[in-house]
Amino acid sequence: MVNPLYQKHIISINDLSREELEMVLTSAAALKARPQPELLKHKVIASCFFEASTRTRLSFETAIHRLGASVVGFPDADNTSLGKKGETLADTISVISTYVDAIVMRHSQEGAARLATEFSGQVPILNAGDGANQHPTQTLLDLFTIQETQGRLDHISVAMVGDLKYGRTVHSLTQALAKFDGNRFYFIAPKALAMPAHILHMLEEKGIAYSLHASIEDVIPELDILYMTRVQKERLDPSEYANVKAQFVLHAGDLLQARANLKVLHPLPRVDEIAIEVDHTPYAYYFQQAGNGIFARQALLAAVLGHNPDQPTS
């Protein structure tokens, strides 16, 4: 079978068709069931985090190590030539691409990952987040988790809560779920942080049902997935942050009318938007969701480097 993702840049979730998403998710399930510690033996992968991260960087680097590859890179831009000496992103990527087989990259500027593809030659770029734009590997682990908990990716009722304006995870996840059939969206956010118009327009063009709401309680009984997000302090001015940070908080009591199959997800880090008491309910699944990032990222790395987890390595 031809691997359509071999040496492909993964910048946006829109770079992947439904069939390609399903291929990656199948591989992720295979890797979760049966680890392959030598699948990427002798490969070297750069972990280039021009913007600091905890979970995404550690998840990627764990995925790399558990596939037998080596990882080089940096956790932030402060001590790089780009940060200290004014080197351009183009030059940085041009040089790093001569050292490695793939580049995992996070950057604070929207479009930076796409720009990097112009200078990496045949070395694939995997976007680990570019500003408020896209976070495709978070979306892959979200899809994997939804499929794991619901047994499907079609006909899902999902609510997204909190910062829907700047939250790149909800943009990517909405676009991904729109590739599947019969999904229904509920968007719950303050007006200042509403889902961007271009996402709503995309849903309208596809004939996908969505609605806007002012409270979580209104929609709980309808949901399969409740996707919480934090208000991103780093992307708001202090006065705006203070006004909206406490508007949408999930408590255990809000889940009394929930379906038995409901799972609460969150891309993390959590601040105050999910009360600690929710952790002890059967609905909480955000820590397992984070753990699934290793398998989703392993599957994507294997695909872009031309390896099939379902077949033994030579």
UniProtKB/Swiss-Prot annotation:
PROSITE patterns cross-referenced by the UniProt entry: CARBAMOYLTRANSFERASE
GO biological process, one term: 'de novo' pyrimidine nucleobase biosynthetic process
Family: Belongs to the aspartate/ornithine carbamoyltransferase superfamily. ATCase family.
Catalytic reactions on record: carbamoyl phosphate + L-aspartate = N-carbamoyl-L-aspartate + phosphate + H(+)
Biological role: Catalyzes the condensation of carbamoyl phosphate and aspartate to form carbamoyl aspartate and inorganic phosphate, the committed step in the de novo pyrimidine nucleotide biosynthesis pathway.
Domain of life the protein comes from: Bacteria
Source species: Sodalis glossinidius (strain morsitans)
The protein's assembly and partners: Heterododecamer (2C3:3R2) of six catalytic PyrB chains organized as two trimers (C3), and six regulatory PyrI chains organized as three dimers (R2).
A Gene Ontology molecular function term of the record: aspartate carbamoyltransferase activity
Keyword Transferase (UniProt): yes
Pfam families: OTCace (PF00185), OTCace_N (PF02729)
GO cellular component annotations of the record: cytosol
Keywords: Pyrimidine biosynthesis, Transferase
Binding site for L-aspartate: K85, R168, R230
Recorded metabolic or biological pathway in which this protein acts: Pyrimidine metabolism; UMP biosynthesis via de novo pathway; (S)-dihydroorotate from bicarbonate: step 2/3
Binding site for carbamoyl phosphate: R55, T56, R106, H135, Q138, L268, P269
Entry-linked InterPro entries: Asp/Orn_carbamoyltranf_P-bd, Asp/Orn_carbamoylTrfase, Asp/Orn_carbamoylTrfase_sf, Asp_carbamoyltransf, Asp_carbamoyltransf_Asp/Orn-bd
EC annotation from Swiss-Prot or TrEMBL: 2.1.3.2
Family matches, as Gene3D superfamilies: Aspartate/ornithine carbamoyltransferase
Annotated protein name in UniProt: Aspartate carbamoyltransferase catalytic subunit
